[in-house]
Amino acid sequence: MQINNFAKIIKLKKKKAWNEDGVASTIGTIMALLVFLTFLGMFTNQYIPAWMEDNENNHMNGIIQQFSFLKWGIDSLILNSDEGEVASVPIYTPMQLHAEGVPIFASATVGRLSFVSENPSYPWFSVSFPTDEDAPAGESGNFVFNDTNGGKAGGSMEFYGANRYYVQQTLAYENGAIILNQTDGETMLSGMAIRIVKYGDEQIVKITQISLTGTNRTIGGYGTKGVTSTLEYSTYSKFENSSGGNLTISINSRFGTAWEDYFTNLLSANSTGLTTAEWNVTTSSSQVGDITYYSVTVIIQGVNVFEHTKAMVAITIADISV
């Protein structure tokens, strides 16, 4: 009986044969998994960022095009209107808020569209020009056209792209100009409506001021929003100063560098007929919270004729996403 029990113990402790095929299969699976994870890491760390950067870049280029359509539509309304006539056809401009993502690997990049109606603070644009006309009854001297009697405009439309891979950018439309701002600076993509010409000894300046009015709104997230522009009125005035007066343009904006560079380049151009002694551009800044505002003052001397157009445009932003 003891011999049989010992035989059983020996039998239980017998070592099983090593399965080489199973080991090879396990190692092959692990190696394949490592190769897959390596390629997945390369895809997510290199290809996905490049893909998303391209998506965000294309989206910002699309926003620039959409802001160009907005400017073109408003300019067309003003050009095609008669003085005092209310435009009957509104202009619709779609604005896509987001940049496309990469399915599974990267979410879409959100954007923010903001509208600020004309107001006494930011932003505003005013002009001042002394004329040959007599001052209104009860006032002495000559009439001065300025911000108190029709020479002031305001309002802005802005888009902020919260890009994660491409540089973060803000695009703004104010007083008929399109401005691009980013972390390393800002530039004027399309200027306001202004023309400076010299006919003989007569210096002529023509300016169109555009005021945006409506309900202040900020919409962020995804989808496409609709911006509707309607011309409320457009007026034209012509002022003269036979001896040549100083035309002063004052701008209060967050994008002071772009405005300063724009006017400096404009007034330096040979086509204006101005010498460097006949114009001046100065800029000052002030801090409100964490936002810096700039006051840009432009003075053009010896202006004989000032032609001024003032347009009021109503802006609405639709909530429905597409």
Functional labels for PLM-detected ranges:
Residues 25, 29, 33, 53-60, ...:
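Short, charged/polar micro-motifs that form catalytic or ligand-binding hotspots
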Residues 6, 10, 29-32, 145, ...:
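Extended hydrophobic/Leu-rich segments
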Residues 17-46, 67:
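N-terminal single-pass transmembrane signal-anchor helix
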Residues 313-315:
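N-terminal targeting/regulatory segments, especially signal peptides of secretory
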Residues 2-3, 7, 42-184:
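Beta-strand/loop motifs with alternating small/hydrophobic and polar/acidic residues, enriched
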Residues 1-21:
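N-terminal leader/signal peptides at the extreme start of proteins
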Residues 116-310, 319-322:
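Intrinsically disordered, low-complexity regions enriched in Pro/Ser/Thr/Gly and acidic residues
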